Regions:
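Flexible loop and strand-edge segments within Gram-negative outer membrane beta-barrel domains
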Residues: 23-26, 208-216, 220-226, 240-323, ...
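Short acidic/polar hinge/loop motifs at secondary-structure boundaries
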Residues: 114-140
Length: 677
């Protein structure tokens, strides 16, 4: 709690001398209102740059797309983007996967700092209220230099609502209902900007029952309840801005155990989790010379309790994290450069009756610098980052026996990126990027020793693990015309000391972390056709091949590699700008997942997944009254034909017996009501 008081005191001291100023300059920390890639601004590389000037593969999920999407959490909302997938445990717990890599190989950024919970766990989701997310930036590969270790697969940057224009106030009331799991989702938002004093407050609540499908019926233990409160108070002045943000998030998800009776019917599950995530962030930007000095300091506390039957407490973790980031960004003529330091301090405590990982302390610091130069036909970009991480694990005696031993490890690593964009013609672009990534093994991989409730296994760490190092090469082509836009993004990624969890024997539940060399290659293709103005035919294809080198056939493929995926959406804009209705559309979508036969079969770790195809239907409109938007209404039907299927990335596929299928048909209706005050 001391960290919270320090941040609050720092903000008060900063703002007090300028509270009497009357400037009304509004300085947005980022701009992401445009949906076209050429106009989108991205912030997760090393500063702020246009996406069209980034050699590294990057995509942006625009605010309207998030509004039109029916999902159960923010990862579920972006998991249909090319190259992005999700590992799920039921309908309420999702973990992001980028080009076949997930867990601690992806950094999720929220409120400007990296989100730190217990992301090493299979059934540990991302503790973020989806209602607070305005847009999402997806960086693929280790090209980002701002976050150091763990950003090997990429970065998900969750952007909050932009600051309101000067002199305006707005309230928003929203609600959504989904039929399959009877989920109700409510949110209330109040934001404004008066005389450069800016604020944004939001409350959200989500209640969901057990989801169901045609084969398993009701999936006991898949229910969840979520509550969140977030706020921002700040100053926008001619010298820059200072924003103080806070959030508190609480979710109570059930844990699907998958046990069945003699008739094959699923039995009720009493296991569940309680997770609390509290955060406070001081975000400052000062205009100095021809650039800006940006500083962020944040404190997070993540508390995770896992209960078994009869409310018996098992695992109980409390994680404290202090994040810091100071960097300078300058743009002059055709040059842009940035340099800074960032890192974090962590302390994790074991407070439960059962133990999986030891208590530990971690300190992480990194320094980075990057430069970009624009020419008539070329954009050249490059940068380096050096990281140092110290980890100390505490010993623990359990019933007179040593459960965890005391040990310390130090890790050092270099991250780098060198890329170019060549503008072949006004319609064609080519992108090249070579990047080097680094990831230190996490405490779970080094020191686990216990049964993990909800994962169906006993996990064993490996003290001898070394850091992962990767080299990734990206090649991309963009084409844009009046009737056709297309993107091709190809990659190859070689990882040394790739860490994975392998089953020790075919009939047991013991798993241990191992390491080896891996190679991933694949890419994404997007083709959008607009033969007539109101009709859009959008297609994507994603593929990744992930293998371990120098391994026998049964352990050749990396576990949890996404199946090849083809998506098509046919959308018709019925009314663009009517007297009462605006942006009215109807859309028919298809998701085709090909057979995944590239599986890690050693000791029955994985099984093949057959192909399946899902159809979705959606519609939406804005409603106007006297020329002003008074409501937005969206209708979504997913898995329209109620197909029984198991995703290759669903952990419930490996529940007892035949496993458990994903959600059946689901119809959702969402209403958003903006109120300008």
């Amino acid at each position: 709690m001391k960290a919270i008081y320090i941040i609050l005191l720092s903000w008060v001291c900063l703002c007090a001398p300028v509270a009497a100023q009357t400037e009304t300059d509004t300085i947005d920390s980022f701009s992401h209102h445009m949906q076209h890639l050429q106009e989108v601004t991205v912030t997760g590389l090393t500063g702020t740059t246009r996406a069209s000037h980034s050699p590294a593969p990057v995509s942006v999920v625009a605010p309207r797309i998030l509004q039109e999407t029916s999902s159960t959490n923010i990862i579920d909302a972006v998991a249909h983007q090319p190259g992005v997938s999700q590992i799920t445990t039921g309908s309420g717990i999702s973990k992001p996967v980028i080009r076949g890599l997930g867990y601690n190989r992806i950094v999720t950024v929220n409120d400007g700092i990296r989100q730190e919970g217990q992301q090493w766990g299979d059934e540990h989701g991302i503790e973020v209220d989806a209602q607070t997310v305005h847009s999402v930036e997806i960086l693929k590969g280790p090209a980002s230099l701002m976050y150091g270790s763990d950003a090997m697969a990429g970065v998900l940057v969750l952007h909050e609502q932009p600051v309101m224009p000067q002199g305006q106030m707005r309230a928003t009331v929203g609600g959504e209902y989904q039929t399959n799991n009877r989920m109700w989702d409510y949110t209330v938002d109040f934001a404004g900007n008066k005389g450069g004093v800016v604020w944004n407050w939001r409350w959200s609540q989500k209640d969901a029952g057990e989801y169901k499908n045609k084969r398993d019926g009701k999936v006991w233990g898949s229910q969840f309840r979520e509550q969140a409160l977030a706020g921002m108070l700040g100053l926008n002045r001619s010298w820059g801005y200072s924003h103080l943000k806070f959030s508190t998030y609480h979710i109570t998800p059930g844990l699907v155990e998958g046990e069945r009776d003699e008739t094959g019917k699923l039995l009720p599950s009493e296991a569940y989790q309680k997770i609390y995530h509290h955060k406070v962030v001081l975000d400052n930007s000062f205009i100095i010379g021809e650039g800006s000095l940006k500083s962020l300091i944040g404190y997070q506390q993540n508390r995770r309790k896992e209960f078994e039957e009869n409310d018996e407490l098992g695992l109980d973790f409390r994680l404290h994290t202090v994040n810091y980031d100071v960097h300078y960004v300058s743009t002059k003529d055709l040059w842009q450069w940035s340099a800074g330091i960032s890192g974090m301090w962590q302390h994790s405590e074991n407070l439960g009756m059962e133990f999986l990982i030891p208590s530990y302390r971690l300190f992480d610091i990194g320094a980075f610098a990057s430069v970009t130069r624009n020419f008539e036909k070329w954009t050249l970009s490059g940068g380096l980052r050096f990281d140092h991480r110290h980890l100390h694990s505490d010993a623990l005696m359990d019933d007179g026996e040593e459960r965890f031993e005391d040990f310390s490890r130090n890790f050092k690593g270099l991250t780098g990126s060198l890329g170019a964009i060549y503008r072949i013609t006004s319609q064609w672009n080519m992108r090249l990027n070579l990047s080097h990534g680094f990831r230190a093994p996490n405490l779970s991989e080094l020191g686990s020793n216990g049964e993990h409730e909800g994962t169906f296994r006993y996990e064993i760490g490996n003290h001898s693990l070394s850091p992962e190092h990767s080299w990734q090469f990206d090649l991309g082509f963009d084409y844009s015309s009046r009737v056709l836009s297309a993107q091709v993004s190809l990659f190859v990624n070689h990882i040394s000391n790739y860490i994975f969890l392998q089953r020790l024997d075919a009939n047991g539940d013991n798993y241990q972390y191992m390491a080896g060399d891996a190679r991933l290659w694949g890419g994404e293709v997007s083709v959008d056709l607009h033969l007539i103005e109101p009709l859009h035919f959008e297609n994507t294809f994603s593929y990744v091949n992930a293998v371990q080198l120098h391994q026998p056939s049964e352990s050749r493929y990396l576990p949890f590699t996404p199946a090849p995926r083809w998506t098509s959406d046919l959308r018709y804009d019925i009314i663009r700008d009517g007297r009462v209705l605006n942006n009215t559309y109807v859309s028919l979508g298809m998701e085709c997942y090909l057979r995944q036969s590239h599986v890690h079969t050693a000791n029955a770790t994985e099984t093949e997944t057959p192909s399946y195809t899902l159809f979705n239907l959606s519609a939406g409109t804005d409603v106007k009254w006297h020329g002003r938007k008074v409501a937005s209404v969206f209708l979504n039907a997913t898995n329209l034909f109620d197909r029984s299927y198991q995703s290759h990335l669903s952990r419930l596929k490996y529940a007892d017996g035949p496993g458990i299928c994903n959600m059946g048909r689901n119809i959702g209706i969402k209403v958003l009501i903006p109120i300008l005050l």
